[in-house]
Amino acid sequence: MKDNRDYIGYGSKDFSFEWPNKSKLALQFVLNYEEGAENSILNGDTSSESFLSEIVNAKPIQGNRHMNMESIYEYGSRRGFWRIHKEFKRRNLPLTIFGVGMALEKNPDVCEQIIKSDYEVASHGYRWIDYQNIDEQTEIEHTILCNKLINKIFGYYPSGWYTGRTS
């Protein structure tokens, strides 16, 4: 296998960049919305989720549900989104939602608040799964499905794309 990584980058050259209006700091607030799209036998997967949780060294449970893992993910849709949404509305702050298509499908109330709040929606994929070993055609289909789904729900195609898992 040929190593084609870039180990040099800018090297010794200084990188100079100036933000508009000579600003010193630019912030973007992003909320990942993934709940319900993770690995689960309820979604037709062979095992439960094991990625990004408070469970140290979590292992997928084959052929069965992982109730602790599901509870951790469900917190985001049941309380997490609403607490963050309330605070952002109180402070009149803009927010970008990195929305996973299947997760958005499962919670119309969250989608309604995203619309009412005029939050920007970027695609975070159709499923919250590791795509590294998924065939290319399925990944393409999921990309198209998610884009169409976001357009159907929000009336526009996603403003951007961020795949948060290996692809």
Model-inferred region functions:
Residues 2-167:
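Catalytic alpha-helical scaffold of carbohydrate-active enzymes acting on polysaccharides/glycoconjugates
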